[in-house]
């Protein structure tokens, strides 16, 4: 079953640093066979308190592979670029 990392962006505080994160992280995503299903800044809240300004959905072969990617030394080496440049959050979900 596939696994997914879903990330939300609420504000990009430093666009240049965030662009550098995207560039730096791309090799890690590729190494783990990630498939970007959605990368959108067009978000409209229908109900509730969830109001991200952007949503990213990335598919991996399995939940375990998605977790392995996130925990990998390669991704952990660049994750602070995202954390420091954008107000964001990420979760991993099982596609079952």
Where are these regions (language model features)?
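Generic beta-strand structural signal
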Residues: 54-56, 88-89
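C-terminal structural segments of small proteins and small subunits
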Residues: 63-91
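Short S/T/G/P-rich N-terminal loop/turn motif that feeds into the first structured element of a domain
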Residues: 1-54, 61-67, 71, 94-96
């Amino acid at each position: 079953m596939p696994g997914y990392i879903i990330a939300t962006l609420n504000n990009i505080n430093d666009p240049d640093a965030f662009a550098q994160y995207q560039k730096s992280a791309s090799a890690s995503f590729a190494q783990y066979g990630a498939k970007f299903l959605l990368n959108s800044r067009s978000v409209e809240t229908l109900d509730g308190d969830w109001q991200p300004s952007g949503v990213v959905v990335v598919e991996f072969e399995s939940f375990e592979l998605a977790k392995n990617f996130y925990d990998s030394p390669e991704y952990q080496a660049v994750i602070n670029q995202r954390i420091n440049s954008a107000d964001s959050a990420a979760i991993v979900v099982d596609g079952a």
